[in-house]
Amino acid sequence: MITLFGSVIETLGDPEEFAKTQPVLFNSTAIVYLTMPKGAPMWSVYDLGAFSMSLMLAASEKDIDSIPAYELIKYPEVLRENLPIPEDEDIIAGIALGYASDAKINEFRSSRMDVDDILKIIK
């Protein structure tokens, strides 16, 4: 976390900039909320993750930017008060969709591990 926060500071120069985008839900045009039936097998989360990635890739194909974020589902009781989410569904993920502005925060790119450090293919 410290490394990530350090990278944000290097990109933005001001850590407050990053924090400002979250309460306004990243100024997104739309938000997709993904739910799962309560009591669903935990492996269903893998399916939901794959669906999430497919959704974001499809959006990207249409030049629509996306960001999955905890901030979008941080207050599930507020979501339930304002959206028709059944009580027998758990709110699992939120994905903001829209068009990125030229704000400095949108220049931030987190570092990634080298694929050889996380993947081993055995033939």
Question: Model-flagged regions — what are they?
Answer:
Residues M1-K123:
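Acidic, surface-exposed loops and disordered segments
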